[in-house]
Amino acid sequence: MTSALYSGGGKSAGSLESALDEERLEVLRWMKEREEKKHRQLALQYDPIVRDYCLVKHGDSGYRMDSSLMTSLPHSRNPPIFEAIQGEQPSDIDTLNLKKVKSGPTSPSSIDRLSSPNAKAGDILASSLFSSGSPPDTTRRNSTSNLSSVSTNSDKSRTIGSNYNMLQSTKSTASQRRMSDSSTPSTTKSKEKIFSPKALSSPTQGASSNVTPESPPEKPIPSFVLSPPPVSATNEANKLSDIQTSSPSQDIPAKHLEPLHLNRSLSSSPSSEDSDLSLSSDSDDDEKKQPSKSEKTSSMSVSIKPPKIIRKGSKEQNRIAKEKASGAPLTKSKSHNDTSTEYDSNSLRRSRSNPAFANDDTVHPNTSFVSSNINNWYGSDLEELEQDVKTAKSMKVDIGPTRWIPTANRTIRCIRRGDFQTAASSSKRNCTYFLTLDLSSESLHAAEWAVGILLRNGDTLIIVDVIECDDPSARAVKDRMESEQLETLEKITKYILKLLSKTVLEVEVNIEVIHHEKAKHLIIEMIDYIEPSLVVMGSRGRSHLKGVLLGSFSNYLVNKSSVPVMVARKKLKKNKQRLGNQSRLANNLSDAIVDEVGRTP
């Protein structure tokens, strides 16, 4: 079945491929529309770039600069220029009358506009800005603003051409060229070239101007007029002829031309980062060595001093980058002819060579210790201990009532510290420890060790003190049994509370004082019944058996207990008076008392 499906599915496979191709084309069309929409939106979001422009209009005595046509147009947000005139947009630039004009004996034919009597002043801008060609790419700010320096004469004076849409024109014949040289109107289509104001201001050698006068435009361009100082018509005619003078091999290429609304003004400096970066470093050096053209034509320009911009790769930016890399302090200083801030890199050398120049402000590094009110050189351990002491004093202690049970010959008391129920429920392990205590020094040391080492929050400590007596049921014994148990219970309670006050434990302590004939047997039975986690006891009791490691009671519990037994042995005091010649045995039984109970004669 599978083979038949693959063998007979040739037609369906072709239709599937065609469907996939159509789907791909649809996706590509959708992506293209989306990109165009994105470019249009980005073009409206960028900040406008204010630039100054100047148009040349015809006059009776040749071409002249018209101060009323000095405009300041933004990048993309300004409304079209032709809308302010009549609201009409030229359909195509081919309908305009253009002619070639030659000025000077050796200069090539420059292209200029010969307007018809019905031509508008805004047609020249509208034809280049709103032509039927593809719109400029607006994915990047000033993407169409690619300024480049063009050499126009032997003095290497730089001019910047401007043209947005260079139309393809047919080659003009020799007769048409002769007609243009003789100032005869020609209908040949040619490329349109509009000289920027900066190009108009470039000084060249003197040359005569042979330009056919035409009627002036009907209305000036009503757009953000920025009027310069008055200019004479004769000087402008001479300067226009100087601009048109060039060699045949130095025609301005089309790739160096840009729209008129993106040209630079007569005196404005670079106003965007992209235009600054596109200028070469050679042109910057030439501008520093030679006097600026705007200074020579100060009567034609408007004095606008923009802020200084640190260009990419400049010496100032490299110096700042080196200072940042070396960690030197950036000291600001102002030059005599510049208002921008600069940084002094010599402050680091002065501070290292002579400490007097360095700042007196000491640097205090940040530490991980939390600031506290304790003014001492100790670390955070002491602060933690004092905080624990404050917490321990503030914790509540619940001391239960004393219960005396005559039938069992015992007295019981329960002590709870802190929130024991919450601690027991939240603890991962709840241990129960069994402590034998007879108020001897060894047993008190065992109690201190158990509270300080073993106990954790939620644990339970059972303290048992067994008092041996011959006949607990006797009346005389019962009368003093209760008072003795209460006295012992109070002593144990006082000692345990003293130990707990030095900790922040939330534990439960059960204290039992019992009278019994055989203390060893009773404790073994209690261990088997309670089943604690660990039994803690002292090395010896009240028998004062010196010289033995374990007493009889401790030795018995170690051998008979069903749970682990921990014997806390207190460190023995060294005897200062020692016999030098006598050897000391490890188990000295000279002072031992032999238990004669159960001996048979």
Curated annotation (Swiss-Prot):
It comes from Schizosaccharomyces pombe (strain 972 / ATCC 24843) (Fission yeast). The keyword Phosphoprotein applies. It comes from the Eukaryota. Residues 141-154, 265-281 have a biased composition (Low complexity). Keywords: Phosphoprotein. GO terms for molecular function: catalytic activity. Residues 286-296, 313-325 have a biased composition (Basic and acidic residues). Residues 128-137, 159-177, 199-213, 232-250, 338-356 have a biased composition (Polar residues). The keyword Phosphoprotein applies. The modification Phosphoserine is found at residues 247, 281, 335. This is Uncharacterized protein C167.05. The lineage of its organism: Eukaryota, Fungi, Dikarya, Ascomycota, Taphrinomycotina.
